[in-house]
């Protein structure tokens, strides 16, 4: 455990951020699974709609600092390729 007051505060804020980021990442994974499920079912409209939602959330995660911009770009392009194959 840290002895310095500011470091004790940083430990608390880091824990809050970690929990927030984990819940956000979990939501992203769920959206990505929904896109994959829509692609598997062959429903192009549903796949396109869920892809749009997932892309927005991925961009938001980048702006909030949850994901690196290249990670989000790779995920978005991979999902777009899957949807385009339908």
Swiss-Prot record:
Keywords: Ribonucleoprotein, Ribosomal protein, RNA-binding, rRNA-binding. GO terms for cellular component: cytosol; small ribosomal subunit. One of its GO terms (molecular function) is structural constituent of ribosome. Pfam families: Ribosomal_S20p. GO terms for biological process: translation. Belongs to the bacterial ribosomal protein bS20 family. Binds directly to 16S ribosomal RNA. HAMAP family: Ribosomal_bS20 (MF_00500). This is Small ribosomal subunit protein bS20. It comes from Kocuria rhizophila (strain ATCC 9341 / DSM 348 / NBRC 103217 / DC2201).
């Amino acid at each position: 455990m840290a002895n310095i007051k500011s470091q004790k505060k940083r430990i608390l804020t880091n824990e809050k951020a970690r929990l927030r980021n984990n819940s956000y990442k979990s939501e992203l994974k769920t959206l990505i699974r929904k896109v994959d499920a829509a692609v598997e079912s062959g429903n192009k409209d549903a796949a396109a709609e869920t892809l749009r939602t997932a892309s927005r959330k991925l961009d938001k995660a980048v702006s909030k600092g949850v994901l690196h911009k290249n990670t989000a770009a790779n995920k978005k392009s991979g999902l777009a390729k899957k949807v385009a194959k339908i």
